Amino acid sequence: MSSHNPTQRVNFASIKNPMEYADFLDVQLKSFKDFLQLDTPPEKRKKEGLYKVFAENFPIHDTRNNFVLEFLDYYIDPPRYTLDECISRGLTYNVPLKAKMKLYCTDPEHEDFETVIQDVYLGPIPYMTESGTFIINGAERVVVSQMHRSPGVFFSESVHPNGTKLFSARIIPFKGSWIEFATDINNVMYAYIDRKKKLPVTTLLRAIGFETDKDILNLFGIAEEVKVSKSTLKKYYGRKIAARVLNSWIEDLVDEETGEVVSMERYDVIVDRDELLTEDNVDQIIESGAKNILITKDDSELGLDYSVTTNTLQKDPSNSEKEAVYHIYKQLRNQDPVDDASAREVINSLFFSEKRYDLGDVGRYRINKKLGINIDEETKVLTTEDITAIIAHLVELMNSKQVVDDIDHLSNRRVRTVGEQLYNQFGIGLARMARTVRERMNVRDNEVFTPIDLINAKTISSVVNSFFGTNALSQFMDRTNPLAEITHKRRLSSLGPGGLSRDRAGFEVRDVHYTHYGRLCPIETPEGPNIGLISSLCVYAKINDLGFISTPYRKVVDGKVDFSENGVEYYTAEAEDDKTVAQGNAPLDENGKFIKDAVYARYGSDFPVVSPSEIDLMDVSPIQIASIAASLIPFLEHDDANRALMGSNMMRQAVPLIHSDAPIVGTGVEQKLVHDSRTQIVAEGAGTVEFVDASVIKIRYDRSEDDTFVSFEDNLKIYNLPKFRKTNQSTTIDLRPICRKGDRVEKGDILTEGYSTENGELALGRNVQVAYMPWKGYNYEDAIVLNERMVREDIFTSVHVDEYILEVRETKRGLEELTSDIPNVSEEATKDLDDRGIIRVGARVHPGDILIGKITPKGESDPTPEEKLLHAIFGDKAGDVKDASLKANPSLSGVVIKTHLFSKAMHSKKDKGGVREIVKKLDEEMEEKLAELRELMLKKLIQLTDNKLSNGIRNFEDTEIVPKGVKLTPAVCSKIEFGEVAIFNWTGDEHTDELVAKLISNYLRKAKEIESEYRRKKFDATIGDELPNGIIQIAKVLIAKKRKIQVGDKMAGRHGNKGIVSKIVRQEDMPFMEDGTPMDLCLNPLGVPSRMNLGQIFELSSMGSRRLDVKFATPIFDGASLDDLDQWTDKAGIPRYGKTYLYDGGTGEQFDQPATVGVTYFLKLGHMVDDKMHARSIGPYSLITQQPLGGKAQFGGQRFGEMEVWALEAYGAAHVLQEMLTIKSDDVVGRSKAYEAIVKGAPMPTPGIPESLNVLLHELKGLGLSFCME
């Protein structure tokens, strides 16, 4: 922009051209966009997201396969309300989802049934705003991405208490039963289905086609086949027999129920498995008539110990496929199967049915990768090859030929983004809907019915609404400041449905892993029970299509770094495992070659020093290790990690100030964060500012001739600036323009500031003059001494907005009413109320003031006939109603800045005719506007096609509307219905076709907008505001509170250096410098050494001098060195390291020792004393114990606990203690008597029995013990 350039900072980074950041909100926006695929034509949509849900559930057939309901396409209409209307009215920002359905009949008997194609309404779906949030019931919410264990196969090892190593392989599918193969202490391998049913693994192998012992042994190449003859077997004496030698015969049995003769195969075991071949049993083998037998190979031939296989065969109760299938069925169902087919069907449906079992793209990819097999990616069910490969891998693992999986490795954990979570919810909803459709199809066999009759729209919306309203991953958005917003949207949680629980999560899951490098921030995570379970994405990290987190690296070939456009590639943790990676700040020459012969690098979890030729990749930037919040801390490399964690978390709690400063010492990420947070108004393209004032910016954008021609919109864009808009955390968004009339703007220019930003940069706090020195003991234990100037000049003043709501209901006794005429209330108390009973904008509010006046009918008794008559003659009596007004709570004081009143349309019979007239008029207006739009559309289309020949224009059913070769004359064009036509390939001329496609697309969008606008107007005329049932009106009052900094407020720097304001000192009493500059803050120097957050000293003693009028960027791990600091402090003419003699403000004398002085960045946090200050005399009591409730929200008391009782006992204060335990706590009779005595001025009565004693007695009686009080 010409007049307002963004802040230019002196950058200390050694890497001057780091890689551009991707959009910080891509994790939300891209995921939702891919879920809906609205910009993709139906025929080009990928099988993912919403399209995949429809593909999986359609077509739907009835039970006799007579009728088929087919899905063709889905689309959405514009939302009924704008974002601001949804927030103020408490509504959900959603769009109507509609689908094109086709119902046809395949039964020749129903020849008269016509195929029906209809647009069916499937209910509203919450729609993501452009800033990556959802508005649900007026509140902004974020769907947090979830980290969970990836589908696939996992190998693990554990040790039994007796010292035996146990091995297991677990297959985790996307959908379906879990199966686990595990060994026990007897070296037998079992298969566990769904962690419950246990069977020898060889039984499963028989059931899936490896019927005989021979098949199973051949699978692993354990045995060799030997011909049965004395001479041949003699060579193998002493070797183990691998498979049973059986003598089989057929026996005829009579079925007792039917009397039929049934043939059954019988077996006799001649020689069992694992018996040694000796002279004694050779004869038995020959007599059995066996042609061949299986002999175990020598250990030297095998190379591996396969005893687990032979041990498992010993435990196997089955001898054939049929027996195995029966055994598995019995294990799963606890009953015998009816027939072979049903037994076989159960096994198939468990692992081999696409409907019941799904490994997903990820599961198939992981299994193929892990086992080195090459099964088609489209095969999403288990195969026999999978099962055999897993068992073979497990045997190798037992023989130490393979290693177990590290479940905390990021190749074994993936991310469920918002799109995938919505896919799961829609899957549940559509499956339910499909069930009801099938039922309705079966019932309406001979009736004429349509897709609309079959589909119930509420099924899907109820599932989706419950997800957004109750799911642990749909969270109330943290909107304290722009950083809090963007961090919340980039958060990854291991908690939630299908994830871990904080009680059972161990240390390993929470710990930092080497694969987190560049993917998950090792610093930013909550303190407390969720530590390590909730993380943040690193600045450069992306989530790939499979849900794995990847990070970018530059390729290095022969010691030379590739700085070309194609030189950067994204690597998942798995792909990076065998690569050697150099640090981002390793010194390079101008050709990109490493200067040093020995380079520090990373290889897996090791940090070797290698030669440049051994390096495969290099970090794109030193910042890539950290998240956005951590990368905003300058000199982070000098801070202890624990304090950096606190610093990252506290920046999110910084309240937006009336006047914010961008930090003098920043890191260079501040501007990108503001741009991507979408909290400011950003230019959408090149253009000129036509008008600016405090609440509106108008910009006329430049457009090409073609774009202007195909558009139906004016190129003047109007932006309304939010003024004192309330956020979820009651902070305010108040934007100011930073452009001027006549300015040229380019795409991406930031046009406003405010809401913790200054001139397009993040500005969470203020730059203040700080001295590290004790001040009369007032900064003991991290307390902060503050200059009164901070209060007087509103340096740390913030505005907070509270919303107060009152509902007007329909009661049994009649309607409630908003009014300023309230019984038994003085005129003085209602002076600020308007006719509707709502307080006027601009009124000052104090505790106890009436905000909204409401009267509600009394419910004493039914009126007598006489009273009814008097009531009818003289109107309402004050006695009929009681005051139900909303009053200001004890801690509220502020100014009313906005009021709203939402009402349902209450039409009498007389009014209904007028409403019909309004609706008719609106319909006529809409038709007129649509006709005008179509006329303009035809005019543009005729001009565009210019009598060109048609290329064969088709509709969505692929029927030709305009035949190929026909001239596109005005007469031909006017007959086309644009809503039903395919918008591509009209004339064969690429440029014309592209413009036609844009023109039709813009026309349809504009037509939908007009229809939506008039639908909304009709809704307002007929129904009024959307309110819940039983509620007639909702009144809202917004009250702004201006909060200056005061004693008890919490403040912090960016390095985890937090403290409470302990004293506000007059400016003249603060320590001052030689030139008379007084300090703004005095901090305790003892807060630095033990906390090891030296970054604050570097920030302070660095360039932080206002004398230079310059700002700095010192990126983390690549910032200013001590030499740089010295250079700039010398330039500013201030002592190195900021050591300066200060003078006492009280006496004017110089202090003995020099103090460290400089300008540092301080924030005011959301923990303010006004919100925490609380006092109670009487209030609510707990129902059972009759003790006062706890906490400010419940207007509770202070708990006088066990240790406090000891203190009073130690002092011998018996009467005070008795009071505490009785009348001040739960002596119900005593406290009312004490209150009465205080009112009357009488002496205090003797305390009675506490209620908690009665509770104890009742509990003991409940155990059957009898007591009586004497």
Curated annotation (Swiss-Prot):
Which superkingdom, per the lineage?
A: Bacteria
Which PROSITE patterns does the record cross-reference, listed alphabetically? RNA_POL_BETA (PS01166)
- Report keywords, A-Z: DNA-directed RNA polymerase, Nucleotidyltransferase, Transcription, Transferase
- GO biological process annotation, one example: DNA-templated transcription
GO MF entry, a single one:
DNA binding
Q: Which reaction does it catalyse?
A: RNA(n) + a ribonucleoside 5'-triphosphate = RNA(n+1) + diphosphate
EC annotation from Swiss-Prot or TrEMBL: 2.7.7.6
Give the matching Pfam families: RNA_pol_Rpb2_1 (PF04563), RNA_pol_Rpb2_2 (PF04561), RNA_pol_Rpb2_3 (PF04565), RNA_pol_Rpb2_45 (PF10385), RNA_pol_Rpb2_6 (PF00562), RNA_pol_Rpb2_7 (PF04560)
- Tell me if Hydrolase is a UniProt keyword of this record: no
Looking up InterPro entries in the UniProt record yields: DNA-dir_RNA_pol_bsu_external_1, DNA-dir_RNA_pol_su2, DNA-dir_RNAP_su2_dom, DNA-dir_RNAP_su2_hyb_sf, RNA_pol_bsu_bac, RNA_pol_bsu_CS, RNA_pol_bsu_protrusion, RNA_pol_Rpb2_2
- Mind telling me which GO cellular component terms the entry cites? DNA-directed RNA polymerase complex
State the family named in the UniProt similarity comment for this chain.
Belongs to the RNA polymerase beta chain family.
Q: How does it assemble?
A: The RNAP catalytic core consists of 2 alpha, 1 beta, 1 beta' and 1 omega subunit. When a sigma factor is associated with the core the holoenzyme is formed, which can initiate transcription.
NCBIfam families from the xrefs? PRK00405.1, rpoB
Protein task: DNA-dependent RNA polymerase catalyzes the transcription of DNA into RNA using the four ribonucleoside triphosphates as substrates.
| Entry protein name | DNA-directed RNA polymerase subunit beta
